[in-house]
Design a protein with these regions (language model features):
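AMP-binding/adenylate-forming catalytic domain of the ANL superfamily
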Residues: 203-226
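Structural motif
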Residues: 4, 51-53, 110, 156-159, ...
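Acidic/polar alpha-helix N-cap and adjacent early helical turns
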Residues: 236-243
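Short, internal active-site loops enriched in acidic
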Residues: 61-63, 168, 217-221
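Conserved AMP-binding/adenylate-forming
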Residues: 1-11, 15-125, 132-135, 148, ...
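Generic structural signal for residues in well-ordered beta-strands
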Residues: 8, 55, 161-163, 213-215
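Extracytoplasmic/periplasmic beta-strand context in beta-sandwich domains
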Residues: 21, 175, 211-212, 230
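AMP-binding/adenylate-forming catalytic core of the ANL superfamily
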Residues: 89, 94-95, 104-105, 117-206, ...
């Protein structure tokens, strides 16, 4: 994109914030960094809008990261500790229409809970790892489904990947991956081959390797192209496949 004189900017927002509420502000000294480090910083969701209070990341409930905590204890700004993004400011919605219980949960502790898990870097920039409900907790390790999907699509034959948690007696949860293959590769790649590649030739950490991989003709998506992981979670449990 830069070769075409295009300068990508990373923004982040929700329906409840009327659009973008953070922006990745480019720093000139980033041009002096190694390419991987430069683009890694550009990929962060950045800092809060001038129309909002500073974006914060707070600890989630240890036993249930999908359940927001009202204590609002901030995580360390070390780029490692994972927490939930919370927001305050004029861009935030007031309430859910005629839904007081959803409103109460959204604003638990006096801040808007996004349901997005992220880390907080020393310079104040945030970096999203996953949705709270999509994180896979395996043997005490937090596996970002987004990160695992990004690694799986580096396989030369995989077009798309979507990962969900499945129960595991030993580890609590393990990843299951649903994939589609590139044109011309239909019927030539099995789930077992993908698992073998992930274990031995991909560079994927062992604890992240999917326990199961299923090849689909297409992944279920909304009309806007968003993955319907709720359906994939149901399929992983043996639910009806009528979508």
């Amino acid at each position: 994109m830069e070769n075409l004189n295009l300068n990508p900017v990373h923004v982040y927002g929700l329906t409840e914030t009327y659009g973008p509420i953070t922006k990745g502000y480019f720093k000139p000294f980033w041009n002096d960094l190694e390419v991987k480090e430069k683009y890694g910083r550009m990929a962060r969701q950045g800092h809060g809008s001038v129309a909002s209070l500073p974006v914060r990341i707070v600890r989630t409930k240890e036993d249930d990261p999908d359940e927001p905590s009202g204590d609002l204890i901030e995580v360390k700004r070390d780029g490692k500790e994972i927490g939930e993004i919370i927001l305050n400011g004029n861009l935030c919605a007031k309430e859910y229409y005629k839904n007081p219980e959803a409103t109460r949960k959204l604003f638990l502790g006096g801040a808007l809970h996004t349901g997005d898990l992220a880390v907080w870097h020393p310079d104040g920039a945030i970096q999203i790892l996953d949705r709270a409900k999509d994180i896979i907790i395996s043997g005490g390790e937090n596996i970002s489904s987004l990160a695992l999907e990004s690694l799986l699509v580096t396989h030369p034959d995989i077009l798309e990947a979507a990962c969900v948690a499945i129960p595991d007696e030993q580890w609590g949860e393990r990843p299951k991956a649903f994939i589609t293959v590139k044109s011309g590769k239909e019927g030539q790649l099995t789930g077992e081959e993908v698992i073998d590649w992930a274990k031995n030739r991909s560079g994927i950490s062992r604890f992240m390797v999917p326990r199961e991989v299923e090849v689909l003709d297409e992944l279920p998506k909304t009309s806007t192209g968003k993955l319907r992981k709720n359906i994939l979670r149901d399929w992983a449990k043996g639910g009806k496949r009528d979508v």
